[in-house]
């Protein structure tokens, strides 16, 4: 929840990619900071007054951190008054909410645990922090976290939540409890489903007067009982007996960081009845409640799950030519880690898509990992006031250019090499962009199949290639000669749809070249335009020259 807790992470800037300041003159720094400040204030007002949210919790948190970092770069630009919720809450907490220190990794957790005893782990439930006050066995107050000292009076709404205990007995009859109101889920797997904007949804239900029936979706996870029993097991037993079942079910003793890591992975990948964004490790013995204050909870720490996405700044826009001759746009990003991958660029796609997304240098992109760990753009979450977008080069290449190497063809030529060595074409083991660049620099190739004629000695002479690797590489190139004919024409770039491939496996070059447009249209997935492209491809002089050269190399089918 946007509850003022993000400031606890500001001490981590030194280890973050966010520590790099924008290369802006002071006037622009003031302008950009003012705009982002105003937007965050507007989002916060909507969130706290209406329970609405135009952006996800993750994006809000990361842009808030970005604003704080910019302020460090350009001090004195705007008043720093948006780090706490709007000052509408006037209900004072009997015991302050401390917040929780966030640890970056397993090493940090191990260091924090050192010399501590009576440690317990809980999932870091993602919802709305709340104080519940019981007097003489009755729920007399429910207070939103607010700034940790004061919050919104939510008592009337809390009494409408069916899952919330309204009556307590014994030691809980006069107690102060702190916990998380959460949206009850059925088998939520965090790794797959992510955060689902759970915080905003809970806040919305608590702040809308017309949502009484929907409050049945809410439950509570009690994570603190200030001045309660000192023994954690007894504490959880009493909470469970009173109807607060989740904290007892999901609180476990730990003594080693390996156990913490195991629970973290287990809860990240397993079905849970709530959304969570990490784990909390806490000491069983806590200071007296009167000593609690915001930002001073030294007896507990959080280790969050790896983020599903990151907000990253665009550092530059580059254009490259793909194997089809189409201009591709790549955004160079501030380097950040996403899952276990260091991400520093993302493929935007065509010039048309780049223009539609309106991405400029300095903009903030939400980046996640698609299949096989490939970065992708989820959204443009913030655009700078001053737009900086390079002019794309004129298009002068197409699907039939750059089979032969020339200085102006270097990008498309390299793209063709990368394609032909991929699993979708000739599947040359261990060969990719870096190796093709090295080979081309040492032994300039005339055309895209010239590597077939390289000797072992030539490959071994390439910088970075050892004698053993050169021998292995030559062997890989030699094995490729036995690939089926259809793989070779795919490597050349034959524009045939997947559905028609099976009917071409028994063909050879001469049979393909002899086909008319009508014969091509008879194949699955081939229409009039594609048939025309296929005939043009097979009769293009450069393609014909490559086919003749492959025939001289005794490649099957040529």
UniProtKB/Swiss-Prot annotation:
Q: What is this protein called?
A: DNA ligase B
Kindly state which reaction or reactions the protein catalyses: NAD(+) + (deoxyribonucleotide)n-3'-hydroxyl + 5'-phospho-(deoxyribonucleotide)m = (deoxyribonucleotide)n+m + AMP + beta-nicotinamide D-nucleotide
Origin superkingdom: Bacteria
Gene of this entry? ligB
* Catalytic site: 124 (n6-amp-lysine intermediate)
Q: Which Gene3D superfamilies match?
A: 5' to 3' exonuclease, C-terminal subdomain, DNA ligase/mRNA capping enzyme, Helix hairpin bin, Nucleic acid-binding proteins
Q: Which PANTHER family match?
A: DNA LIGASE, DNA LIGASE B
Query: Which GO molecular function annotations are given, in alphabetical order?
Result: DNA ligase (NAD+) activity
What organism, scientifically named, is this protein from? Klebsiella pneumoniae (strain 342)
């Amino acid at each position: 929840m946007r509850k003022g807790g993000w400031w606890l992470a500001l001490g981590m800037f030194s280890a973050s990619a966010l520590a790099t300041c924008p290369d802006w003159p002071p006037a622009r720094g003031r302008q950009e900071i003012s705009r982002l400040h105003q937007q965050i204030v507007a989002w916060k007002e909507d969130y706290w007054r209406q329970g609405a949210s135009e952006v996800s919790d993750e994006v809000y948190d990361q842009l808030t951190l970005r604003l704080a970092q910019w302020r460090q770069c350009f001090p004195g630009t705007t008043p720093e008054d948006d780090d706490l919720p709007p000052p509408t809450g006037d209900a004072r907490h009997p015991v302050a909410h401390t917040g929780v220190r966030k640890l970056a990794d397993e090493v940090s957790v191990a260091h924090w645990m050192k010399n501590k005893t009576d440690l317990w782990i809980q999932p870091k439930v993602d919802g709305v922090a709340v104080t519940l006050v019981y007097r003489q066995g009755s729920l007399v107050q429910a207070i939103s976290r607010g700034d940790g000292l004061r919050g919104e009076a939510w008592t009337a709404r809390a009494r409408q939540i069916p899952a919330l205990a309204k009556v307590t007995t014994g030691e809980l009859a006069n107690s102060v409890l702190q916990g998380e109101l959460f949206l009850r889920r059925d088998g939520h797997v965090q790794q797959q489903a992510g955060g689902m904007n759970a915080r905003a949804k809970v806040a919305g239900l608590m702040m809308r007067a017309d949502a009484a029936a929907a409050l049945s979706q809410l439950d509570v996870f009690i994570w603190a009982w200030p001045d309660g029993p000192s023994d954690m097991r007894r504490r959880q037993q009493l909470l469970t007996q009173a109807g607060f079942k989740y904290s007892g079910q999901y609180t476990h003793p730990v003594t080693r960081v390996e156990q913490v890591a195991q629970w973290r992975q287990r809860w990240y990948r397993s079905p849970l009845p709530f959304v969570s964004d990490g784990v909390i490790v806490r000491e069983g013995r806590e200071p007296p409640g009167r000593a609690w204050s915001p930002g001073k909870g030294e007896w507990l720490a959080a280790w969050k799950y790896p983020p599903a996405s990151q907000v990253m700044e665009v550092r530059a826009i580059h254009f490259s030519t793909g194997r089809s001759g189409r201009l591709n746009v790549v955004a160079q990003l501030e380097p950040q880690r996403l899952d276990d991958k260091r991400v520093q660029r993302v493929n935007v796609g065509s010039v048309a898509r780049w223009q539609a997304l309106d991405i400029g240098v300095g903009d903030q992109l939400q980046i996640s990992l698609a299949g096989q760990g490939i970065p992708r753009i989820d959204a443009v979450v913030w655009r700078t006031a001053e737009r900086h977008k390079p002019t794309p080069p004129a298009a002068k290449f197409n699907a039939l250019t750059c089979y032969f190497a020339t200085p102006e063809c270097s990008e498309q030529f390299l793209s063709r090499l990368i394609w032909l060595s991929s699993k979708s074409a000739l599947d040359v083991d261990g060969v990719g962009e870096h190796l093709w660049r090295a080979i081309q620099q040492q032994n300039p190739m005339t055309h895209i199949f010239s590597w077939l004629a390289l000797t072992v000695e030539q490959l071994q002479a390439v910088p970075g290639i050892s004698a053993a690797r050169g021998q292995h590489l030559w062997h890989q190139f030699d094995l490729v000669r036995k690939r089926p004919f259809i793989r070779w024409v795919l490597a050349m770039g034959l524009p045939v749809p997947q559905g028609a491939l099976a009917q071409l496996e028994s063909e050879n070059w001469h049979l393909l070249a002899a086909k008319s447009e009508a014969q091509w249209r008879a194949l699955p997935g081939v229409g009039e335009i594609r048939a025309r492209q296929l005939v043009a491809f097979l009769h293009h002089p450069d393609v014909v020259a490559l086919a003749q050269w492959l025939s001289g190399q005794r490649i099957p089918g040529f």
